[in-house]
């Protein structure tokens, strides 16, 4: 087992072996974000679902009210006047067959891919390169649409797509260490409400098993899910 650095050992010593109240947990994670860059704050949610069953899968989007603090490079696959609409709305890349061909060759200089429905038969052929990276456009995620301007605006403003992995765990970034504790709490509350609102129909037993939050380089802190659910929406 690799030896922990003095910095990590010191940070771990600050985290007690208990479940923290939401705001208290966020304040501790912020305090432990001591790297020389603005660390990303992440949530890791273990749910009582088995995604190998279609009625226990979770894939949706959340619009974080305080944004993510990160810029998102968006690529759009469409044709005709829609390409100009995409560029005007702020897409970094926009193309038709040429962009499909470039992606097929492994050129993936973007964080999010949006496509219009008419281009999906061609985009579907890119499943081998897009699928493993979680970049395949999907109507449920809002990344297959004819309203490109609205979609680009939402994702630039902090809308995120997330899904439960094969183990039923959701990993989502919800801000930066430079955010205020209240801003992070507002984002985390919105994430919790979104996960509850999109509970899979086949989920059985206890839905929320655990919620941990952490910064990029810091230790994780367990959050009291019930206390988070009980917070007022304008907490």
From Swiss-Prot:
Q: What CDD domains does this protein map onto?
A: Ribosomal_L1
Q: Which domain of life is it from?
A: Bacteria
Q: What is this protein called?
A: Large ribosomal subunit protein uL1
Task: Name the job this protein performs.
Answer: Binds directly to 23S rRNA. The L1 stalk is quite mobile in the ribosome, and is involved in E site tRNA release.
Which species is the source of this protein? Prochlorococcus marinus (strain MIT 9313)
Q: Which GO terms describe its molecular function?
A: rRNA binding; structural constituent of ribosome; tRNA binding
Give the signal peptide, or none. none
What InterPro entries does the record tag this protein with?
Ribosom_uL1_bac-type, Ribosomal_uL1, Ribosomal_uL1-like, Ribosomal_uL1/biogenesis, Ribosomal_uL1_3-a/b-sand, Ribosomal_uL1_CS
Annotated family: Belongs to the universal ribosomal protein uL1 family.
């Amino acid at each position: 087992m690799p030896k922990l650095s003095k910095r990590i050992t010191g940070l771990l010593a600050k985290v007690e072996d208990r479940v923290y109240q939401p705001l208290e947990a966020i304040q501790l994670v912020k305090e432990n974000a001591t790297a020389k860059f603005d660390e990303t704050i992440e949530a890791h949610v273990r749910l009582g679902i088995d995604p190998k069953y279609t009625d226990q899968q979770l894939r949706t989007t959340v619009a974080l009210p305080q944004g993510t603090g990160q810029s998102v490079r968006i690529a759009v696959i469409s044709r005709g006047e829609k390409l100009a609409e995409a560029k005007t709305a702020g897409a970094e890349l926009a193309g038709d067959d040429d962009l499909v061909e470039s992606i097929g060759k492994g050129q993936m200089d973007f964080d999010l891919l949006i496509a219009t429905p008419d281009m999906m038969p061609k985009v579907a052929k890119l499943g081998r390169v897009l699928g493993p990276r979680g970049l395949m456009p999907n109507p449920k995620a809002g990344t297959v649409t004819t309203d490109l301007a609205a979609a680009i605006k939402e994702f630039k403003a902090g809308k995120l797509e997330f899904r439960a992995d094969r183990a039923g765990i959701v990993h989502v970034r919800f801000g930066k260490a430079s955010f205020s504790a209240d801003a992070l709490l507002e984002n985390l509350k919105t994430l919790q409400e979104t996960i509850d609102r999109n509970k899979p129909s086949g989920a059985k037993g206890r839905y929320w098993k655990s919620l941990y939050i952490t910064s990029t380089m810091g230790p994780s802190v367990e959050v009291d899910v019930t206390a988070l659910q009980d917070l007022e929406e304008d907490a």
